[in-house]
């Protein structure tokens, strides 16, 4: 699963990407220093794995992963090919969701592409370019569907959905703000609309702003806008996150977080929220060889989850032996879990839950 980090030039995208991945993407105080997108594979923080590792003492611990893609800074006119517009739009089309970095801090030493700080204007600039690109896609799709309608009436349903989305786009709204049922979503899935992608707003703030996020004018403006489209906002000071990421050990990181009065790093929040944004969760396998988190979509049934480990396990699925992480931690061992009758045997219709610890039984 891929999250595209987007934003106007000089808002802190590449610095955020560097901090998240420690990949050292070129970062400079001028537009377009990222042309080909940098891709970083990042482990999803999960303390459940650490606790299971203490219990099982495995040879290795494997976290779930998520990919972040640092996409070139966008400018007005991108939908018409301005700046790096065409490349930007093709790269953003390939990601599963969007993390939009918005500059909310004042600093005369860091030039703003529009000369002043206005997070709502910046969000509107990016959203407008994506909306214009989507309108072009919708118009082409409508034209084709109307031609096909003459031969097959089933295209009327597609036309109705496209028309509904077009009206929202023309009103300056994103496609994700349009309520669609499952059938409607399926009809336009292969249109690969940009503004239908789930979006997370990252408000890049100063250290001073971070100390009082509830009362910050810029952050509250972004939250208000995000609420209208059911998006989440995470305020973070990307400069602090860069410093934290450069520290070698967890003790130093913890000490710095305590000094700043923070429970966890903003990056951990971004990674976890990105995982949620994509409707993902983890089931766990635990034993002496390995403790591991496996990524699945929420609502996945047991046989399909088994297929994440190996296709043979899905094909020959018999049952899943399941205990919840909380039950195992409370009882302290798998033997105690079995004695209390907390180890369940689940069949092919069982819907997996986040934190299920599973042993799949199969026969091929």
Stretches with model-predicted labels:
Residues 32, 46-49, 62-68, 82-95, ...:
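Amphipathic alpha-helical transducer elements in NTP-driven molecular machines
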Residues 97-98, 105-133, 137-140, 196, ...:
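Switch/coupling subdomain of P-loop NTPase systems
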Residues 74-80, 115-130, 149-154, 210-214, ...:
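Flexible beta-alpha connector loops of hexameric P-loop NTPases
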Residues 2-6, 17, 144-351, 363-364:
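C-terminal-of-GTPase-core extension/linker across diverse P-loop GTPases
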Residues 81-84, 113-116, 215-218, 248-250:
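Short, glycine/charged-enriched secondary-structure capping and boundary segments
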Residues 22-23, 48-49, 73-75, 103-109, ...:
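Conserved nucleotide-binding/hydrolysis micro-motifs of P-loop NTPases
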Residues 1-111, 120, 139-140, 145:
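Conserved G1/Walker A P-loop phosphate-binding module
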Residues 353-358:
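Structural motif
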């Amino acid at each position: 699963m891929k999250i595209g980090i987007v934003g106007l030039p000089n808002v802190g995208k590449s610095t955020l990407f560097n901090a998240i991945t420690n990949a050292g993407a070129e970062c400079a105080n001028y537009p377009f220093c990222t042309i080909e997108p940098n891709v970083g594979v990042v482990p999803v923080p999960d303390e459940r794995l650490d606790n299971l590792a203490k219990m099982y003492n495995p040879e290795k611990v494997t976290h779930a992963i998520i990919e972040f893609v640092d996409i070139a800074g966008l400018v007005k006119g991108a939908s018409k090919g301005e700046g790096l517009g065409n490349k930007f739009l093709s790269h953003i089309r390939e990601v599963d969701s969007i993390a939009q970095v918005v500059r909310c801090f004042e600093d005369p030493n860091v030039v703003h592409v529009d000369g002043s700080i206005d997070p709502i204007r910046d969000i509107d600039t990016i959203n407008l370019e994506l909306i214009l690109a989507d309108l072009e896609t919708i118009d082409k799709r409508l034209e084709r569907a109307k031609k096909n309608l003459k031969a097959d009436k089933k295209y009327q349903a597609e036309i109705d959905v496209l028309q509904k989305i077009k009206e929202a786009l023309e009103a300056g709204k994103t496609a994700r703000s349009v309520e669609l049922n499952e059938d409607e979503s399926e009809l336009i899935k292969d249109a690969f609309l940009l503004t239908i992608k789930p979006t997370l707003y990252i408000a890049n703030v100063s250290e001073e702003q971070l100390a009082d996020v509830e009362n910050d004018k810029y952050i509250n403006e972004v939250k208000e806008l995000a609420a209208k489209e059911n998006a989440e906002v995470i305020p973070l000071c990307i400069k602090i996150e860069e410093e934290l990421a450069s520290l070698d050990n967890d003790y130093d990181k913890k000490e710095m977080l305590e000094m700043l009065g923070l429970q966890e790093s903003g990056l951990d929040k971004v990674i976890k929220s990105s995982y949620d944004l994509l409707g993902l969760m983890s089931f766990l396998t635990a034993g002496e060889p390995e403790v591991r988190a496996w990524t699945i979509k929420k609502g996945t049934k047991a046989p399909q989850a088994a297929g994440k480990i190996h296709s043979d396990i899905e094909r020959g699925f018999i049952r899943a032996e399941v205990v919840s992480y909380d039950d195992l931690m409370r009882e302290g061992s798998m033997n105690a879990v079995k004695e209390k009758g907390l180890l369940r045997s689940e069949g092919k219709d069982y819907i997996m839950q986040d934190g299920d610890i599973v042993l799949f039984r199969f026969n091929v």
